Swiss-Prot record:
PANTHER family per the UniProt record, alphabetical: 4-HYDROXY-3-METHYLBUT-2-EN-1-YL DIPHOSPHATE SYNTHASE (PTHR30454), 4-HYDROXY-3-METHYLBUT-2-EN-1-YL DIPHOSPHATE SYNTHASE (FERREDOXIN), CHLOROPLASTIC (PTHR30454:SF0)
Family: Belongs to the IspG family.
InterPro entries cross-referenced by the UniProt entry: Dihydropteroate_synth-like_sf, IspG_bac, IspG_bac-typ, NO2/SO3_Rdtase_4Fe4S_sf
Gene Ontology terms, MF aspect: 4 iron, 4 sulfur cluster binding; 4-hydroxy-3-methylbut-2-en-1-yl diphosphate synthase activity (ferredoxin); 4-hydroxy-3-methylbut-2-enyl-diphosphate synthase activity (flavodoxin); iron ion binding
Full protein name: 4-hydroxy-3-methylbut-2-en-1-yl diphosphate synthase (flavodoxin) 2
Top-level taxonomic group: Bacteria
């Protein structure tokens, strides 16, 4: 029998540019920056003071692949809940602090893995940096300097007229310099804007002027569809240039959706080992089957599969056989039937009514073999006879 490869390429695809060299920090047990893989994070939408609901949402995010979670802390009740949440969370918890510097200290004392501060709206922030640096250093707590276009310091708005890339970068580097004066460099930085073009230019300038790890984000990106497009465009541009160490896709949607999009962006750029990938044609007048329905049913049937499997669902004989051959598993449909391919070889032909069922069965067989041979989490391909 001809050998069939059931794994992934032994040499992963390289990003378009070499990764920017940045210093590495520890956010709890997770390394960010340096040679650490680009991580994906999100933010809870619950009231942090509701410990049960917040931990439940963190558990859902963790299951979806989230690696860092941020929680809001606008009140004393929220601050009081941080210790329990930080202790019980499966992933590092970052406290998101605005307006009140006292909550920065509360978050550090509570054992949060990191604290995000917004220099544009924390009262007397510059005067508090020395104390924050001392407390953070004592507890080993990194600080994220999170600059947002919507809350930029008034003096910078007066200087630049609006939230330009230069204004965002100046704000971030100024605050970083204050921490540096107190020998604190356990820092990561974000300079977010809701315009992807402004955001990309800001991060490019920032990357050229410092070696701190960078948290990428398009702030207030919008509803799911619009926000996904904005984030994909901005992150794709920066990550393909080697810029970015951790990402947060901001969507007006459930937080789990942010993780799905973020992971897909990294997989698409070769920055994360791909998991299940459905390749399907957009359909046209040549299609002899309902490609939309087939693709949706196959996707639903394989939801949750973690192995790096590429499945092609093709609707006609033009590109169908070629795409199916390039996939781990695929179907080229036409004339009321479908040819099922495994690694380029036709293994059977089935009626159209059996295509989805057959693809799912074959995918499960391949996944089981891959797991048995140690390739489920992205190890080199194996060959079976």
């Amino acid at each position: 029998m001809t050998a069939i490869s059931l794994g992934v390429p032994e040499v992963p695809v390289r990003p378009i540019a070499e990764r920017r060299v940045s210093r590495q920090i520890q956010v709890g047990p997770l390394a960010v920056g340096g040679t650490a893989p680009v991580s994906v994070q999100s933010m809870t939408t619950t009231r942090t003071s509701d410990i049960g609901a917040t931990l439940q949402q963190i558990a859902e995010l963790t299951a979806s692949g989230c690696q860092i979670v941020r929680v809001a802390c606008p009140t004393q009740d929220d601050a009081d809940a941080l210790a329990v949440i930080a202790r019980k969370s499966q992933i590092p918890v970052v406290a998101d602090i605005h307006f009140q510097p006292k909550y920065v200290f509360a978050a550090i004392e509570a054992g949060c893995a990191a604290v995000r501060v917004n220099p544009g709206n924390i009262k007397q922030f510059d005067d508090k940096v020395k104390e924050i640096a001392r407390a953070a250093k004592e507890h080993g707590t990194p600080i994220r300097i999170g600059v947002n276009a919507g809350s930029l310091d008034r003096r910078l708005l007066e200087k630049y007229g609006k939230a330009t890339p230069e204004a965002l970068v100046e704000s971030a580097l100024w605050e970083a310099s204050l921490f540096e004066e107190h020998d604190f460099r356990d820092i990561k930085i974000s300079v977010k804007h809701n315009d992807p073009v402004v955001m990309v230019n800001a991060y490019r300038q920032l990357a050229a002027q410092c070696d701190y790890p960078l948290h990428l984000g398009v702030t207030e990106a919008g509803p799911a569809f619009q926000g996904t497009i904005k984030s994909a465009v901005a992150f794709g541009a920066l990550l393909s240039e080697g810029i970015g160490d951790t990402i947060r896709v901001s969507l007006s949607a459930p937080p789990v959706e942010e993780i799905k999009v973020g992971i897909q962006i990294l997989e698409s750029l070769g920055l994360r080992q791909r998991r299940l990938e459905i390749v399907s044609c957009p359909s046209c007048g040549r299609a002899q089957v309902d490609v939309y329905k087939l693709a949706e049913e196959v996707t639903a049937g394989l939801e949750g599969m973690e192995v790096p499997l590429r499945v092609a669902v093709m609707g006609c004989v033009v590109n169908g056989p070629g795409e199916a051959r390039e996939a781990d598993l695929g179907v080229a449909s036409g004339n009321g039937k479908g040819q099922i391919f495994v690694k380029g070889e036709v293994i059977k032909t089935v009626p159209e009514s059996k295509i989805v069922e057959t693809l799912i069965e074959e995918a499960m067989k391949i996944a089981e073999q891959m797991e048995q041979n140690g390739v489920a989490s992205g190890e080199p391909a194996v060959t079976v006879s």
